[in-house]
């Protein structure tokens, strides 16, 4: 099961799983797009789903179980509207929280209820922004911090044989990043790592978590360490953010 898989990271994860021989069910809020993607990559089903609705996860879980035992559930659906807290519309704030966080929680619950005695893996798409301050992406980062937190907690709660993981990428070359405001602070910070990561890199990192004892995987590792350091002294992080932003703006101009 892969949510948010019509394009971007979700599609990349699904393509890799199909290539590895899995029967893959993919979902997306855009029904036509996910149906086309399913046909193009060889997924067994492409279903329209609004991850904000708890019942939708039970419905797609039932469809997945029609094709065999459930072995992995990837909670990937998400949105990334950028802007300071005071700039975002109320609908955007609500959407960020409901899609990025509630969508993951409902998906995790459905997966846990659907695994058989052989167990399985839950892999959540989080973000490096969930590890420290990211001005210009404050609400998005808050939702991803919550995903990191619940991943670590449920990894302990989960029954034996069930692995719970999250992949935390830096900026990735996806439509989500492309739609960010070119002059905004968020776009600059997301682009400050030297280059945007590829969908294929993150898909590989996510799929490799299946069967692993690792709970969190940051990509790249050095940026994860930098974000954790900024979280330890947020009052001192503004200077570093300025340097990262300047580097990112140069990258965006290129």
Q: Which residues fall in each region the model found?
A:
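Active-site helix of classical SDR
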Residues: 108, 143
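Active-site-adjacent segment of SDR/Rossmann-fold oxidoreductases
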Residues: 20, 132, 153-163
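C-terminal helical subdomain
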Residues: 166, 187-227
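Canonical Rossmann dinucleotide-binding motif of NAD(H)/NADP(H)-dependent dehydrogenases/reductases
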Residues: 1-25
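Substrate-binding pocket helix/loop in short-chain dehydrogenase/reductase
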Residues: 84-85, 89-94
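Active-site loop immediately N-terminal to the catalytic Tyr-X3-Lys motif
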Residues: 86, 134-138
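Residue(s) in the substrate-gating loop at a strand-loop-helix junction
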Residues: 127
């Amino acid at each position: 099961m892969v949510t948010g898989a019509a394009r971007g990271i979700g599609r990349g994860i699904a393509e890799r799983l199909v290539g590895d021989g899995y029967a893959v069910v993919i979902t997306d809020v855009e029904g036509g797009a996910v149906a086309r993607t399913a046909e193009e990559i060889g997924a067994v089903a492409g279903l329209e789903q609004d991850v904000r609705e708890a019942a939708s996860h039970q419905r797609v879980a039932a469809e997945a179980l029609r094709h065999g035992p459930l072995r992995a559930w990837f909670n990937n659906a998400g949105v990334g509207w950028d802007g300071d807290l005071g700039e975002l519309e109320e609908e955007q704030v609500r959407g960020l929280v409901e899609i990025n966080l509630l969508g993951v929680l409902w998906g995790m619950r459905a997966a846990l209820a659907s695994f058989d005695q052989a167990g399985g893996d839950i892999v959540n798409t989080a973000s490096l922004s969930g590890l420290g301050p990211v001005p210009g992406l404050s609400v998005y980062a808050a939702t991803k911090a919550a995903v990191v937190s619940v991943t670590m907690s449920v990894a302990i709660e989960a029954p034996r044989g069930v692995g719970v993981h999250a992949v935390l990428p830096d900026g990735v070359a996806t439509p989500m990043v492309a739609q960010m405001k070119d002059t905004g602070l968020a776009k600059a910070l997301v682009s400050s790592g030297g280059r945007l990561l590829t969908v294929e890199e993150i898909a590989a990192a996510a799929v490799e978590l299946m069967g692993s004892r690792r709970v969190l995987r940051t990509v790249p590792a050095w940026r994860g360490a930098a974000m954790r350091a900024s979280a330890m002294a947020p009052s001192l992080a503004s200077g570093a953010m300025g340097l990262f932003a300047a580097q990112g703006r140069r990258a965006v101009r290129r």
